[in-house]
Structures are given as structure tokens and as C-alpha cells.
A protein has these predicted regions:
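Hydrolase active-site cap/lid region
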Residues: 228-279
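C-terminal catalytic histidine-bearing segment of alpha/beta-hydrolase fold enzymes
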Residues: 316-363
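Alpha/beta-hydrolase active-site loop
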Residues: 185-206
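Short substrate-entry loop that stabilizes the transition state in hydrolases
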Residues: 128-131, 136-178, 250-251
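N-terminal cap/lid segment of alpha/beta-hydrolase-fold proteins
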Residues: 75-128
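Short beta-strand/loop motif that positions the catalytic acidic residue
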Residues: 298, 304-306, 310
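N-terminal low-complexity, Pro/Thr-rich disordered segments
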Residues: 19-68
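C-terminal motif of bacterial Sec signal peptides marking the signal peptidase cleavage site
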Residues: 15-17
Length: 363
């Protein structure tokens, strides 16, 4: 991760959304399975030691962010590698599709490294290359029923048929990926880390003919929020990004719409509102896990695509996110289509617009 100027700490979660494939069984109101119980209360701390006088180097050091926050994600060092091609899923006149895995590693400022094997699907166009690439971040599908490559099958094929390598990231805890037992308590920030590391794994690969300086991100629903957090945490990583039918860029809104439950419901011990406090009780935490307060860190052009009759992620969310991006100085465009969340009749037109955007930005 490049050194970068410090900005006040925050970090992120995406708690909702669904997939684009009309055949995918995606819930618009996800209720994730419990993963772990909240930690027990810590013992009383020792008396605080006397602070030494700050030095000039101390003043220049980047201040620590909340560990569970978007800026906490930024302060980690991310390394993606070991992209391995597996079985051929599909072989068409335009592209070959493979099952793949890659390694997603993140190291904290304290030097603690976590490493996960992430599964996915890779479509590679026919020809010699090198080809531009798009990393795909899918929407919410219950990990208990999710299957490898599910959620953006149409988009993956469309991109590859137009000459783009398309890497669909399953995320940790999905399909053949390793399980992170704390992914819920960490507000699913690991999903954004996996997307960042997917880009780096493509760039490190000798087996995939990728133009490693011509890569973009493409996320649907929950995945739209995933890629916005990746842009905040790793400015300059890619050349462009396209959030489709995205969840809100304020995590409190996502929680209220998709995850808030009866206060007496104890069936989900990893409910973030129960563990970290509800948005109205701990607003600082929820802002720290939102991308919007840190849009001024984003350096890439953004194309937002949204349906006017989306009843899963309300159109007002897209309007608010776009306005906040523009106010922060981001080159953002918002395209509207007369369609719903999953994009049926307007899919081809929306994909053609998105590919024109990628063609312009990755040229």
C-alpha cells in the first residue's frame, strides 16, 4: 500500500443488496447466519503511562484509525497474489471461463497478517492480449446458499465478449473461499480487502494476459458499497469504477433498511447493532464504517447506474451518493434507467453505457 496522507479514521460494512442474475436466489433483506459471539468485557486497564514528549517524527506519523473502520482498512497493507486457474467452466467463441483462486493478505500497522484463499470465476477473451480487466463485486446472497461466480454472470460474459478480462470475486466466507469467523463483527470490511487484493493478484499473475495498468471495479448492490470502500482505502489502485444499483454510502441507512431487528431477538449474536451499538446510539462508529465521509480520498472517475423503480436500494440513495461524490471533487456521473433493482429490460443498454465508460477511462 502506498504511503498516503492521514485522514481521520473510519471504516466500512455493507449489509445488504442482492444479485443481478434473474435466476439467482438473492434476498433483499439479508439475515446472515451467526458467526461468533461478542467478546467478553475486558478487565480494567492498567494505569495509563506517562506520555513522552512528542518528537518531530511522531508528529509526522500517520495517526491510528479505528481498527474496524474504512480508514483502518486503508492503514493495512494489502497483498494479493497466487492467482491459480482451475477447471474450465465454459469455452465460447469469444472467451474461456475458469474457476480460480487467489490469496488475499492484509497486514495491520502492528504487523499482524491475515491470509485467506478466495475463490472466484475468471473470463479471459480469446486472443493474445494483453487485455484490460474488470474486477466484479457481487451483491448480497446468503453465503449458506451462494455458489461460485453467482450474482454477476451476465455482466462477466458481456465484458469478456467485449474484450475485457472479468474476475468475479466470491469474497471470504463464500463458495470455496476460506471462512473468516469475524467477518460480520468486522462489518464485512474483508470483502473490500478481497476486491483490492483481486486487483493485485491480477497484476502479479504471469498466467493471465492482463494490462495491469488498465483495471476497473464493477459492483452491484452490496458490491457497489464494497467497491466504494475499496476506492477510499486504496486511492489510485484502479482507473475507474462503476457501482450499479448500489446500497447507501451511509452504513446506518443500510442497517436500518436491511438488518435492524427486534431488540429482544437474540438469534443473531453478531448483529452489528447489538455488538457495536445502534446507529442512533453510536453514530461515530457507523460513520467510520461509511464511505461517504471519505469521498475526498477517491481519485478515480465513477459511473453510477441505478433504476428509477428500484425498490431494494431506493433511488434517493443513488442521488445522495452522487451528490456527495461531486461535492468531494470526484468525477462522478449518474445514469438512470427505467428498470428495477436487477436490471431486466434495460440491462443491455446499461451494460453498453458502462462499457463505453470503461473504454474511455481505460484507453
Amino acid at each position: 500500500m502506498r504511503a498516503r496522507l492521514a485522514v481521520a479514521g473510519v471504516c466500512a460494512l455493507l449489509l445488504s443488496g442482492c444479485s443481478s442474475d434473474s435466476s439467482d436466489d438473492a434476498s433483499a433483506d439479508p439475515s446472515p447466519a451467526p458467526s461468533s459471539t461478542p467478546p467478553a468485557s475486558s478487565p480494567a486497564p492498567d494505569p495509563e503511562p506517562t506520555e513522552p514528549e512528542p518528537t518531530e517524527s511522531d508528529a509526522a506519523a500517520e495517526p491510528p484509525a479505528r481498527p474496524v473502520s474504512v480508514l483502518g482498512l486503508d492503514q493495512q497493507t494489502h497483498r494479493g497474489d497466487r492467482l491459480r486457474l482451475g477447471a474450465v467452466r465454459e469455452d465460447t467463441a469469444d472467451y474461456t471461463s475458469y474457476d480460480v483462486t487467489f490469496r488475499s493478505r492484509s497486514t495491520s500497522p502492528a504487523g499482524q497478517t491475515e491470509s485467506w484463499t478466495i475463490s472466484g470465476v475468471l473470463n479471459v477473451p480469446k486472443g493474445r492480449g494483453p487485455f484490460p480487466a474488470v474486477v466484479l463485486a457481487h451483491g448480497f446472497i446468503d453465503p449458506a446458499v451462494y455458489e461460485r461466480g453467482q450474482g454477476m454472470t451476465r455482466e462477466r460474459g458481456y465484458l469478456a465478449s467485449r474484450g475485457y478480462i472479468a474476475l468475479h470475486v466470491d469474497y471470504r466466507n463464500h463458495a470455496e473461499s476460506d471462512d473468516d469467523p469475524r467477518y460480520q463483527l468486522r462489518m464485512r470490511l474483508g470483502y473490500s480487502a478481497d476486491v483490492i487484493n483481486a486487483v493485485k493478484a491480477l497484476q502479479a499473475s504471469r498466467d493471465v494476459p492482463v494490462a495491469d495498468d488498465r483495471i476497473a471495479l464493477f459492483g452491484r448492490s452490496m458490491g457497489g458499497g464494497v467497491i466504494l470502500k475499496a476506492l477510499v482505502a486504496e486511492p489510485g489502485l484502479v482507473r475507474a469504477a462503476a457501482p450499479w444499483a448500489s446500497v447507501s454510502s451511509l452504513e446506518g441507512e443500510n442497517y436500518d433498511r436491511f438488518q435492524r431487528t427486534d431488540p429482544d431477538d437474540t438469534s443473531r449474536p453478531d448483529d452489528p447493532g447489538r455488538v457495536h451499538g445502534l446507529p442512533e446510539d453510536n453514530p461515530e462508529f457507523w460513520l467510520a464504517n461509511s464511505s461517504r465521509p471519505h469521498f475526498d480520498r477517491i481519485t478515480e472517475p465513477v459511473l453510477m447506474v441505478h433504476g428509477r423503480v428500484d425498490d431494494t436500494c431506493p433511488p434517493r440513495w443513488a442521488t445522495a451518493t452522487h451528490r456527495a461524490l461531486v461535492a468531494a471533487g470526484v468525477d462522478s456521473q449518474l445514469e438512470w434507467y427505467d428498470d428495477a433493482h436487477a436490471f431486466g429490460p434495460a440491462f443491455d443498454a446499461a451494460m453498453d453505457r458502462t462499457i463505453r465508460f470503461f473504454d474511455q477511462q481505460l484507453a
